Regions:
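Short hydrophobic alpha-helices and adjacent helix-cap/hinge residues
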Residues: 1-220
Length: 220
């Protein structure tokens, strides 16, 4: 109809996830551009659900949304395989991967991706340090007690199960809980003071690029 937009621009993970969760004709047919979103994402459930126990399936923007009219986008990709390869290169005796994620959409989205990718590595045990069900202090204590031959893969940590935003030096405090643990990062969190390294997306401002693509699309 005359009130249908010519284009929808979606910035950020939450906006993108909310949009692709709309199973409607207008959402699927309206041209859309996304920015500051990852290749992996989640489709939100229809009804209210206890997110502490929700086990969502990781979806891929390239392969799972062919029925949506996505005309352009600037996305970043978390590469679990390259990080496992890097960890094994440094620590060939690694037997376990402890993954840290928080009580946010981004944290759960990363956790769903890592769960999917870790199915390729049946020889590795995965330990979930999950801010949906654990407080910062509980995660810190579990870090202290992690067994030998464990490497940590750091996702994100901003909000724990109390829904309190944690302060900026939280990663320093987690580091100090077990300073000898080898830690790698999938999202650049902890680089420079805790994580040894990691394959992370190349985050960058996309406003000008999206503006140019939008202008070109509407000017056709």
């Amino acid at each position: 109809g005359k009130n249908r937009p010519s284009l929808v621009i979606l910035l950020g993970q939450e906006a993108w996830s909310a949009y692709i969760s709309q199973d409607t004709e207008i959402a699927k047919k309206t041209p859309s551009i996304c920015g500051m979103v990852s290749v992996n994402g989640l489709v939100l459930p229809d009804d209210s659900i206890d997110t502490r126990v929700w086990e969502p399936e990781s979806k891929n923007i390239y392969t799972d949304f062919g029925d949506y009219n996505i005309v352009a986008g600037y996305v970043y990709e978390y590469d679990v395989d390259k990080n496992i390869e890097l960890m094994r290169r440094f620590y060939p005796d690694m037997r376990r991967v402890a993954f840290i994620s928080d009580n946010t959409y981004g944290g759960l989205s990363m956790q769903a991706l890592v769960k999917k990718e870790m199915e390729k590595y049946p020889d590795l045990e995965t330990i979930w340090l999950d801010g949906r069900t654990e407080t910062f202090m509980e995660v810190s204590e579990r870090m202290r007690r992690l067994p030998q031959n464990t490497c940590v893969l750091l996702g994100t940590w901003r909000v724990d199960c109390t829904e309190s935003y944690v302060i900026g030096n939280t990663t320093y405090m987690l580091r100090d809980a077990n300073p000898t643990l080898p830690v790698f990062t999938i999202a650049s969190v902890g680089l420079g003071h805790w994580a040894l390294g990691g394959y992370t997306p190349e985050y960058h401002a996309v406003g000008k690029n999206i503006g140019a693509v939008t202008y070109d699309f509407l000017d056709k």
